[in-house]
Amino acid sequence: MTLSRLLFATVAALWLALGQAAPAPQTIRIGVASPTVGSPPIFTAGPFGIAYSKGWLEQEFKRDGIKVEWFFFKGAGPAVNEALTNRQLDFALQGDLPSTVGRSVGLKTRILAMQGVRTNLYLAVPPDSPIKSVADLKGRKVGIFLGTNLQLPSDRVLADHQLSERDLRVVNLDLAGIDNALITRNIDAGFTDQRVLKLRDKGLARIVYTTRGTAPRYTRQNALLVADDFANRYPDATTRVVRALVRASRWVSDPANEAETYRLWAQMGVPESVIREDLSGEPLRSQFSPLLDDFAVARYRDVADGLLALKLVRRPVAVPDWFDHRFLDAALQAEGLTGYWLPVNAAGSNVARAAPAPKAGQAKS
C-alpha cells in the first residue's frame, strides 16, 4: 500500500470510528446491471445481492437520515451506462465490458471493489442439435447479449476456433431471451451463463462448451463503481458503501453461512444445485474477493485492449488510473479484514498467504 493510500485509509477509518461530521448526501442511488425477479422484487445475486436482501446498506445509513435507492436494469450494462451519463446514479454494479465502454466514451467513474471474478460462460444448443463444437457455429443463428460482459469472452472463444461474429448470424438477446429462443428453437445456439444448466437438467438444452477451468481471459468480472463527482463530494459515504460490500463478501466467504448463501442466491430463479455446480472447484472466499489485485487490473486491461482491437471502442482506456484503491483499503481496515483475502496475480495465481478468518465478533461493525 502506498503512503497516500495508507493515509487515506487511516483518515477514513478514523472518520468512521469516531463518527466525526463529514459531508453527507441526502440520497445514495445504486444501479445494478441486472433485473430483479418476482413481486415484491428479489435480488440476491453475489455479495451485494445479499447486502440488498438483508438491508445492510439501509441500516448503515439510517442513523444519518440518508436514503438508499436501488435501480435494477433489464438492459444490463448498457442501460446502466445511460443512467450514469444522465447523472441518475451514484454507484453501479456492472460487468467489465460495459463499464470499460463507458469509460472509453468519457464516463467519469472509479472502480472501487470487485463484486465477482472469473464468472463462467456457456455455449448451449437445443438437445437434438447437430452442433457438436464451437467450430460448428459457422453460418448458424447464435444468440449473444451484445454490449454486456458476455460479448468479449464469446468473441474470444470464437476466435480460438477461427471464427468471428461475422461468420455467424448473431441475434442480440438478453439471457432470458436466449433461454426462450433455445426452447423454441428460434436460435441454433446461445452464449449464456449458469442459468442454462437448468434447461440442461430439464432436457431442454445441451452444453457444447464452457469456460469452466479454462484460462482467465475467457472469464467475466463484475465490480462496484462510483461516479467521480460523488466520490469527491462524499468520501465518507463512499467508504461506507464499500464497507457494506466488504461485510457482505466476508459473510459469503464464511463456511458457516454457506447454506443460507446458496438458499438466498437460488431465490433468483436458478436452482441451488446449478449454482453449486457452476461455482464448484474454488472456495467462495476466492470467487467473491473484493480485492483490486493484479488479476482484476489485468482482466480490465485485457478487456480494454480487446475492445480496441475489435473496434468496439475508438479510444484506449488507461485502466490502472481507473482503479481507486483508497476506499477499499479504508473499508478493509475499518472491518479488521486487511489481509483476509488472498491477492491474485495477473495470471490468476495466488501471490501471498491470506490471513485467517477473524473469529466471531472480531470484525468491527
What is each residue range found by the language model?
Residues 129, 171, 176-269:
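Pocket-lining segment of extracytoplasmic ligand-binding domains
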Residues 27, 37-68, 85, 103-105, ...:
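Short, polar/charged alpha-helical segment
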Residues 93-105, 155, 187-207, 299, ...:
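A ligand-binding cleft/hinge motif common to bilobed small-molecule-binding domains
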Residues 28, 275-365:
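Segments of small-molecule ligand-sensing domains
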Residues 70-82, 95, 163-183:
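Short helix-initiation/N-cap motifs at beta->coil->alpha
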Residues 126-141, 232-236:
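Flexible hinge/capping segments at coil-to-helix
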Residues 37-38, 234-316:
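Secondary-structure end/capping motifs
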Residues 29-45, 135-147, 247-251:
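Short loop->beta-strand "edge-of-pocket" segments that line small-molecule binding or catalytic clefts
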